[in-house]
């Protein structure tokens, strides 16, 4: 999945760099947006949510969950940011529902309530699988919760983002916790 995203980014950048006119750029923008709205967002809406709670750890190109895959909290934060931003851009209720679900999952299952930070991975029941805390994941958690607040006005997301920032970056990171 990572290779595909990197390849798409490189392709998009190359095409954009070679665009000869504003019309070419506009055509490319329209095609990319169409792919986002018609393919990418629906794929995640239809396949990411695990009926047992949270999100699948990995999904094949066929849309089927890969059993036993680790559930990275960074994925939850990325889903949250993506659908909050999509809701803010397009105003579709289904995007808000997905963003709200992701926010609740992130807040309730992925954050270390005692010391701050996002755990690296959780299991299917929401229990900590890998308690390592990476600054990148925590920063993306703050970023995604902030976007959720911006898109929906959800105060719990803003308060959680502020608390995460205070515990993690203002008070300092305790590597033992």
Model-predicted regions and their roles:
Residues 20-177:
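Glycan-recognition and catalytic cores of secretory/periplasmic carbohydrate-active enzymes
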Residues 1-23:
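Bacterial Sec-dependent N-terminal signal peptides
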């Amino acid at each position: 999945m990572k290779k595909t995203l990197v390849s798409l980014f490189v392709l998009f950048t190359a095409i954009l760099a070679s665009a000869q006119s504003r019309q070419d750029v506009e055509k490319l923008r329209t095609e990319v947006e169409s792919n986002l709205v018609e393919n990418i967002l629906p794929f995640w809406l239809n396949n990411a949510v695990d009926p047992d709670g949270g999100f699948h750890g990995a999904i094949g190109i066929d849309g089927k969950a890969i059993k036993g895959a680790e559930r990275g909290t960074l994925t939850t934060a990325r889903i949250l940011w993506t659908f909050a931003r999509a809701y803010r851009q397009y105003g579709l209720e289904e995007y808000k529902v997905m963003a709200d679900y992701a926010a609740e999952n992130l807040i309730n299952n992925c954050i270390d309530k005692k010391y701050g930070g996002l755990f690296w991975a959780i299991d299917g029941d929401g229990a900590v699988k890998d308690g390592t805390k990476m600054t990148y994941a925590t920063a993306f958690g703050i970023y995604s919760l902030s976007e959720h607040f911006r898109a929906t006005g959800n105060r719990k997301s803003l308060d959680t983002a502020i608390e995460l920032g205070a515990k993690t970056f203002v008070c300092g990171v305790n590597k033992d916790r």
